[in-house]
């Protein structure tokens, strides 16, 4: 006996990352939330499952509370079922167990207070799955979740091409998984739903004539509106078509779950929503900016767990930490993900907010600690003061994190692993007008070399890094050795250089280090620059300056003044750094390049000292 109808789990999923611009929320509301909810409300017989992240629901509560009233009414008449999950749409596989449970319970509590019911099932962000997720999901009372039909195929589901719900198990805990038919989701947004479902049912009955039940789940995220057709009308057209469809009836998954018997048992491999997507664990390795956020998250978690006896403060710190765990930072690039500096800024602000909470109610003792912060098997060096964190590494001998804690801002939140005090030795004929950031042909680009630790003075909090002469005889300026000393005193980071010529011939070169700073944005609305001299501070209208004693940077958003000075006058160039991997130029940082002409006889030394001061 063939299936007479499709049992359709119609769903709606939406999320806007924490830290996104308000216009992103308004666009999501206008294109999906309002038309879907208001359209569904007109058709009481169409049931649906809704998953909207805690970030989005909280914004709706403040900006469009009338929408929550419609949802509450439909929950009350059992037309819709709210799905749980992590409040901040976290990348579940890579966050600690206590954070998985904490985020899920936070959204569960919100939904219960808002709509009067605990969710029975949940949404897995980006369908980022590892089998070990079953235990924490089940421990939080989640009886079911959803994964893509592609993931069902990877797990060895029904070879006929249509997947049935299944059981997943881990450490004695089980959860039911519903397949989401992604090709149908796309088709529904482009074509009339009734003939699509009719063709789907016919094909299913041909392939599986003995099956009497055919469950299909879809979460369409967009629908094509015709010419002069509003989004409200387009979604309403979908609901009208579905209400007249004879080939399907809708149901909520929680009710279906009670009647499902004899489900197959499957084990899903580590996977995500599309074949092109890499796992979140690989993502943080391939993209250093994601790896930096992940490392800071792990480090901050360690600090929080060291708190003893103050449960309220510990919970507050965890709730700040959770804001930085959004999946967009660990699975997507471009404006919707990692290359949106607003999202990274918000993540670091939350992490630093959590760190500040761990320091409350105690006298903070400044320190210099060797620690494998990046979890790469090599030690980094962490300077920590009351106002500034400054982290240095042997790779390139640069500073890779520079936190100004009073404003909860990481000024090294740059893109592509860019650092401060990344050293470059250029040919002496190199013109300042031609200077660009990054590697330069014919130069010694020291940021790709390994610096050895020469000395570590934890008491005086000083670190000396050494770069030997190049082992490659033909390398440019390979006879130049560099000693670099870092220290941190209150609001100022010091970097002292000594260059030595270990060769037998005179060396002429231009020293042009890169100091990358992640400022709030590009242009005078965000930042202003001034060249400093003994006479006056001169506003910079051009990216070039000459003979300056220092450079002042006014961060207008954070109301912070950053001053870069040197014990020698210097020329320099300022260049914005953008990322255009996805075809759209997105601001990431500002590269400051002071320039010095150096001439060294054999055995001769030359030095310069920088001071980078923060104030507000």
Where does each model-flagged region fall?
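Polysaccharide-binding surfaces and accessory modules of carbohydrate-active proteins
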Residues: 491-494, 500-572
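Acidic, contiguous internal or C-terminal segments within carbohydrate-active enzymes
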Residues: 118, 202-209, 467-521
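Acidic-aromatic substrate-binding/catalytic surfaces of carbohydrate-active enzymes
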Residues: 26-30, 98, 102, 386-459, ...
């Amino acid at each position: 006996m063939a299936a007479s109808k499709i049992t359709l789990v119609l769903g709606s999923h939406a999320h806007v990352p924490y830290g996104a611009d308000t216009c992103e929320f308004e666009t999501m509301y206008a294109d999906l939330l309002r038309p879907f909810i208001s359209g569904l409300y007109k058709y009481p017989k169409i049931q649906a499952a809704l998953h909207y992240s805690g970030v989005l629901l909280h914004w709706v509560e403040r900006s469009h509370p009338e929408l929550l009233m419609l949802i509450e009414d439909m929950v009350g008449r059992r037309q819709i079922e709210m799905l749980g999950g992590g409040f901040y749409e976290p990348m579940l596989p890579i966050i600690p167990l206590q954070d998985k449970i904490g985020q899920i319970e936070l959204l569960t509590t919100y939904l219960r207070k808002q709509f009067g019911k605990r969710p029975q099932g949940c949404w897995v962000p980006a369908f980022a799955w590892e089998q070990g997720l079953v235990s924490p999901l089940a421990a939080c009372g989640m009886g079911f979740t959803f994964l893509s039909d592609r993931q069902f195929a990877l797990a060895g589901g029904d070879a006929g091409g249509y997947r049935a719900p299944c059981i997943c198990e881990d450490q004695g805990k089980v959860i039911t998984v519903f397949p989401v038919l992604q090709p149908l989701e796309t088709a529904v947004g482009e074509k009339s739903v009734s003939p699509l479902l009719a063709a789907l049912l016919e094909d299913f009955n041909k392939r599986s004539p003995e099956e009497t039940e055919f469950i299909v789940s879809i979460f369409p995220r967009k629908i094509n509106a015709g010419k002069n057709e509003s989004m409200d009308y387009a979604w309403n057209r979908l609901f009208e078509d579905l209400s007249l469809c004879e080939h399907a009836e809708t149901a909520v998954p929680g009710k279906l779950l009670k009647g499902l018997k004899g489900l197959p048992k499957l084990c899903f491999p580590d996977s995500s929503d599309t074949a092109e997507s890499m796992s979140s664990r690989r993502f943080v390795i391939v993209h250093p900016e994601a790896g930096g956020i992940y490392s800071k998250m792990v480090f901050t978690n360690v600090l929080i767990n060291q708190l003893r006896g103050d449960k309220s403060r510990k919970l507050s710190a965890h709730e700040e930490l959770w804001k930085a765990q959004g999946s967009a930072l660990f699975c997507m690039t471009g404006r919707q993900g990692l290359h949106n500096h607003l999202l990274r800024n918000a993540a670091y602000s939350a992490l630093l907010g959590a760190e500040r909470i761990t320091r409350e109610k105690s006298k903070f003792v400044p320190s210099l600690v060797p620690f494998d912060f990046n979890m790469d098997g090599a030690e980094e060096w962490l300077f920590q003061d009351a106002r500034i964190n400054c982290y240095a590494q042997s790779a390139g001998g640069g500073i890779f994190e520079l936190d100004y804690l009073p404003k909860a801002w990481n000024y090294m939140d740059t893109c592509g692993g860019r650092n401060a005090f990344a050293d470059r030795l250029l040919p002496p004929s190199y013109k300042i007008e031609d200077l660009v950031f990054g590697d330069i042909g014919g130069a010694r680009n020291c940021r790709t070399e390994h610096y050895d630790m020469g000395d570590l003075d934890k008491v005086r909090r000083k670190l000396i890094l050494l770069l030997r002469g190049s082992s490659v005889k033909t390398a440019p300026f390979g006879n130049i050795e560099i000693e670099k000393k870092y220290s941190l005193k209150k609001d100022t980071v010091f970097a002292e250089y000594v260059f030595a010529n270990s060769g037998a011939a005179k060396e002429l070169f231009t020293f042009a280090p890169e100091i990358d700073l992640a400022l709030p944005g590009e242009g005078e609305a965000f930042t202003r620059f001034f060249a400093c001299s003994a006479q006056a501070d001169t506003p910079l209208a051009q990216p070039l300056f000459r003979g300056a004693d220092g450079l002042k940077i006014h961060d207008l958003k954070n109301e912070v003044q950053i001053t870069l000075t040197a014990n020698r006058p210097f020329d320099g160039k300022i260049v914005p750094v953008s990322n255009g991997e996805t075809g759209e130029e997105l601001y990431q940082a500002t590269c400051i390049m002071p320039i010095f002409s150096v001439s060294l006889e054999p055995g001769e030394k030359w030095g310069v000292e920088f001071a980078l001061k923060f104030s507000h």
